[in-house]
């Protein structure tokens, strides 16, 4: 990282101020920073030169007894970086508090890209070979005098800010140097909390229903129009949606009821006319008309290209949203999950019609508890009511989905990812299964598209292909699509991840029944009403997991194949989900820390599995995104929390530093990038992932405005384990090896390095 930054408090001295300086915080959100109050073109002086008003330098503090600060609100202290100085030798330049006057945004943007974006991808990164310097005007001189902005980080931030200014239709802007050389830890945290979550938030309302309902994944004639399906007994929601469709017929929005009984056959019948599934809505009074109207609760989506509510992504995003005080969005997602279970029978993979048979890893009990606590817990009747409804729904899903056929294996008493479904998953990209279908097409002497139609219409029967797609749907339900761990076997595996989550459900339900509902949850079947009932279920599950999944010698929980009745040997990071659930004994936790953790810890954090388990790669056996060498935010978050639960916060601190370094380094070197997953074995370009589906969050022009949902959360949550010393190190991109190596002996212990 290079450039120049203020790393010292300003000296006391007299200064002039301006109305702009007093109003606009250098770290405010783009809608404020590039709003009308800061537009130079609207603040022209009436002097004889008709020149833009001259503003004084904005300093974070000045004068004896004067207190003023633009410190980011997300940190109690600001720890800026030291960077190389430029030619400007003024006092303000030496303090890193210059302000730049960009007289022509479009012209400057073009010049910047022409000079610095040498690979033409509309980003400025360490891979570009430009001069890494640009001249810009100063505010004090109305742009007459120029200074230099240097280095990849500041230039990429300049590109981001100019791109945002253009989005707000700004022709001229005044930019604070503090915004361009902001400590990257502060900047990323600020963007996640103040901008990314906003960009990822959706809700079903009259303004965007057609956009959200439109499906980009399905390319059939009947999929051209936006469509939404509504549960048969949701008349208010149905009428509201019909009203919106009639308000603007040009949208061609179709609103249809679903039947009471939803079968796999019915779900398949919707594949050529897919639609969005209605979510929870609440009644509001229209302030203009005074009439009652229904509006959807807000929810967050994983990435910018998504409009659906996703299953387990939502839990991890909720953790970050709560950390950012976005309680309304986190609560909205709990409301949606309650609605989905009540009306669709389960928390869905996502709220599209072709996901009606498929769930995802269950996290509702912990999610509801986190939201309830943020709402005030038992001191808030609204929070307790939400908790009651959420746990009632979670228990329903537990009994009818996760511990029922076909997901429950009766012999072991453990559960598998075994969803219903018929035919080929329609949401996959064209050609995704061609290598599998080719031999069947040749068998029937037809083309692959023709065979696909024959198979989906059940005019031909291929039992082996049925089993293949059963496992494929299971992989998608597991959330780990795809991995060699699950290939051609997923539906037959009692996995440590799913059964850890169900154990967590059991202990959470026991806790809530006892604490909030007088140890008697009315309306439940016999054997499931009291805390003692659920504690017994948890004890039995732990015994079965220890019997079938735990391996004392290696210190791993492995998956168990219920068909072959054999334990697998695939070393997955999900072994640590048992710690997150609180299911392991202290002795088991120690074995995992001593034996499993060293195998899964890499340069940038925890890897999804070991290289040995993944096996050799080839043209016929390509990389899978949920395997080595990739690391994922949900794994980091659960393992951090699980280790802390068992007294290993030192290891959590070390692992979190590794992951946060990787994220920060990519953010600094690659134009503010925040992506879905990282290669945790690479220190230079960890965002570059060569696997199926690419890497969500990497494809942007000029500025990243969303990041990726659960990765955003991981940064906020990981920072909670960092002290000021670690934050400073991350802000200057000190590698884990150097950082750990320079720690004093007492500090090394805090990172599990003694």
From Swiss-Prot:
Its main location: cytoplasm. It catalyses: alpha,alpha-trehalose + H2O = alpha-D-glucose + beta-D-glucose. This is Cytosolic neutral trehalase. GO terms for biological process: trehalose catabolic process. Ca(2+) binds at residues 117, 119, 121, 123, 128. InterPro entries: 6-hairpin_glycosidase_sf, 6hp_glycosidase-like_sf, Glyco_hydro_37, Glyco_hydro_37_CS, Trehalase_Ca-bd. Residues 1-47, 54-73 are annotated as: Disordered. One of its GO terms (cellular component) is cytoplasm.
